[in-house]
Swiss-Prot record:
InterPro entries: Domain_X, Maturase_MatK, Maturase_MatK_N. GO terms for molecular function: RNA binding. Usually encoded in the trnK tRNA gene intron. Probably assists in splicing its own and other chloroplast group II introns. The keyword RNA-binding applies. Belongs to the intron maturase 2 family. MatK subfamily. It holds the Pfam family Intron_maturas2. It is found in: Plastid, Chloroplast. Keywords: Chloroplast, mRNA processing, Plastid, RNA-binding, tRNA processing. It comes from the Eukaryota. This is Maturase K.
Length: 507
C-alpha cells in the first residue's frame, strides 16, 4: 500500500489520480492473489501459458488487446464454452485482469480510509466490524422510539449509473472505459448482482469486484440520505468515520458538499425530527424514529421518489414496511427484536402514608425464532419438521470423535451467535436436538441403541456441546450449577462475529 500511495502522490499535484497505468504493474496481481479470491487460477493458468513471469506486463497488454477485439465479444449460445485463448476458456483473461482491476479501483477509497484513521487511537479496527456491534446500539436507542421502517434496498441498478457514480472517485477516463467494458460483458453473461428474496447473491467469480460495486452503489444511495438525517436532527450525531461495519463501505462521510443546504431546505422542513436512526444490513436497512405515522410515511415516499429520480429505479412502496415497535417484531439478523413494556410496582413510604406506584419501562427484547431455526435444522437433516431429532447419514470411514466434534462445533457456533437472546429456552432446545441427533447418528453407525451410547459416553458427550465460556465456568464453580444458569440468563453480545450464522439465515 505504501508503494501505491507513493505512486499516486506524484499525480496529486496535478489534481488527478491515474489508476490505469497500475494495471500493468506486476505487484497488483500479487496483491489480488494474496486477498484469497480465486487464488489458484492466476498462477496455475500462467504456468500453463508457458510464461516464466507469472504476471508480466506483456501478458496483460496482450490480454487487454484481445479483450477489445470485436469478434471475441460475440457470445453464442451453442458455443458458449468453446471460445479459447491459448487453450483456456474465453473468460480466463478477463477474469485475470478483473482481479487486478478490483484491487486498483479500491485504492482511492483505501487511501481515504487510511487518512481518516490518522491521529485516532484505534489498535485493531477489525474488532469494530462485528455484526453484533449493531445490537448494543439498538438496545440503547430502540427502547425510546416508536416506529421503524424495514427497507429493502432496490436492485438491480443500470450498469451505466454505476460507472457515473464512480466518476467522482476514479477520475482517469481509461479506467472508467475498462470498468464499463467489464460491466457490459458480465451483463451479457448474466453474472451480475441477482436478487434472491432480500439477499444479494454475487457471482462466485470476482466476488471482490462485485462487492466493491455494490458497496459503492449503496454508498451513493446513503450519501444524501445521511446528510438529510444529520440536518433534520436537533441533536447532531458525531460521524462514525473510524468505526468499520462489515457491510458498510470504507468510511462514512464526514461532511457533504455545502451546496446541498440550499437545495434541500424544503425537504428538511418536512422531515424535522429530533430522533432518527439508520442501520443497514444484508441488503436491507432500518429507519427508526420517535415521530408520528405521518412522518414515517413522508420518509417512505421520499425514499421511493429518490430512488426513481436519481437511479432510474422503479421502486414500489411495498419495499418499505412501517411497523410500530410496541405491536410488531422486527426480523433482524437471525433474531426477532421487539420493544415491550416491563411493568414494575414501587411502594413509597412518606411519614404515616404509603403509596403504591405502577410504572412501566420499555425493554428491548431479542428472541431466537425457534420455529424458523428448527426448520433450518430440519433442512440440514438434524431433525424432522416437528423438531424431533433424527440420525444424520455420515460416511462409513468417519470416526466417532470426528462426528462428535462436528456436531459440537455446530452447537457451539449457534450458541455463540445467539448468545444475545433474551430467553435461553430456545437455545436449550436446539442443544437438545443436536445432542440427541449426534447420539442417534452414532447409534446408527454402530447398529446399537441410543440409550447404550448415552450411558457409555455420559458427560464426555455433554462436554463437547459446551461453549468455551461454559466450560471454564464449570471448572471454576464445579458444584454451583445455579451460578451458570444465572450468568447465562442475560444477554451477551460477542464482538468477534463477522458474518451471520448459516443456520440463522432463514431467508
Amino acid at each position: 500500500m505504501k508503494e501505491l500511495q507513493g505512486y499516486l502522490e506524484i499525480y496529486r499535484s496535478r489534481q488527478q489520480d491515474f489508476l490505469y497505468p497500475l494495471l500493468f504493474q506486476e505487484y497488483i496481481y500479487v496483491l489480488a492473489h494474496d486477498h484469497g479470491l480465486n487464488r489458484l487460477i492466476l498462477y496455475e493458468s500462467m504456468e500453463n501459458l508457458g510464461y516464466d513471469n507469472k504476471s508480466s506486463s506483456l501478458v496483460v497488454k496482450r490480454l487487454i488487446a484481445r479483450m477489445y477485439q470485436q469478434n471475441h465479444l460475440i457470445i453464442s449460445a451453442n458455443n458458449s464454452n468453446q471460445n479459447k485463448f491459448v487453450g483456456h476458456n474465453k473468460d480466463f483473461y478477463s477474469q485475470m485482469i478483473l482481479e487486478g482491476f478490483a484491487v486498483i479501483v479500491e485504492i482511492p477509497f483505501s487511501l481515504r480510509f487510511v487518512s481518516s484513521l490518522e491521529g485516532k487511537e484505534i489498535l485493531e479496527s477489525h474488532n469494530l466490524r462485528s455484526i453484533h456491534s449493531i445490537f448494543p446500539f439498538l438496545e440503547d436507542t430502540l427502547s425510546h422510539l416508536n416506529y421503524v421502517s424495514d427497507i429493502l434496498i432496490p436492485h438491480p441498478i443500470h450498469l451505466e449509473i454505476l460507472v457515473q457514480s464512480l466518476r467522482c472517485w476514479v477520475q482517469d477516463a481509461p479506467s472508467l472505459h475498462l470498468l464499463r467494458f467489464f460491466l457490459h460483458e458480465y451483463h451479457n453473461w448474466n453474472n451480475f448482482i441477482s436478487p434472491k428474496k432480500s439477499i444479494f447473491i454475487f457471482s462466485k467469480k470476482n466476488k471482490r469486484f462485485f462487492l466493491f460495486l455494490y458497496n459503492s452503489y449503496v454508498y451513493e444511495c446513503e450519501s444524501i440520505f445521511v446528510f438529510l438525517c444529520k440536518q433534520s436532527s436537533h441533536l447532531r450525531s458525531t460521524s462514525s468515520g473510524a468505526l468499520l461495519e462489515r457491510t458498510h463501505f470504507y468510511v462514512k462521510i464526514e461532511d457533504l458538499v455545502i451546496v446541498f443546504r440550499n437545495d434541500f431546505q424544503t425537504i428538511l422542513w418536512l422531515f424535522k425530527d429530533p430522533l432518527m436512526h439508520y442501520v443497514r444490513y444484508q441488503g436491507k436497512s432500518i429507519l427508526a424514529s420517535k415521530g408520528t405515522p405521518l412522518l414515517m410515511n413522508k420518509w417512505k415516499y421520499y425514499l421511493v421518489n429518490f430512488w426513481q429520480c436519481n437511479f432510474y429505479l422503479w421502486s414500489q412502496s411495498g419495499r418499505i414496511h412501517i411497523k410500530q415497535l410496541s405491536n410488531h417484531s422486527l426480523d433482524f439478523l437471525g433474531y426477532l427484536s421487539s420493544v415491550r413494556l416491563n411493568p414494575s410496582v414501587v411502594k413509597s413510604q412518606m411519614l404515616e402514608n404509603s403509596f403504591i406506584i405502577d410504572s412501566a419501562i420499555n425493554k428491548f427484547d431479542t428472541i431466537v425464532p425457534i420455529i424458523s431455526l428448527i426448520g433450518s435444522l430440519a433442512k440440514a437433516k438434524f431433525c424432522n419438521v416437528s423438531g424431533h431429532p433424527i440420525s444424520k447419514p455420515v460416511r462409513a470411514d468417519s470416526s466417532d470423535s470426528d462426528i462428535i466434534d462436528r456436531f459440537g462445533q455446530i452447537c457451539r457456533n449457534l450458541s455463540h451467535y445467539h448468545s444475545g437472546s433474551s430467553k435461553k429456552t430456545s437455545l436449550y432446545r436446539i442443544k437438545y436436538i443436536l445432542r440427541l441427533s449426534c447420539a442417534r447418528t452414532l447409534a446408527r453407525k454402530h447398529k446399537s441403541t441410543v440409550r447404550a451410547f448415552l450411558k457409555r459416553l455420559g458427560l464426555e458427550l455433554l462436554e463437547e456441546f459446551l461453549t468455551e465460556e461454559e466450560h471454564v465456568l464449570s471448572l471454576i464453580f464445579p458444584r454451583a450449577s445455579f451460578i451458570l444458569r444465572r450468568l447465562y440468563r442475560g444477554r451477551i453480545w460477542y464482538l468477534d462475529i463477522i458474518r451471520i450464522n448459516d443456520l440463522a439465515n432463514h431467508q
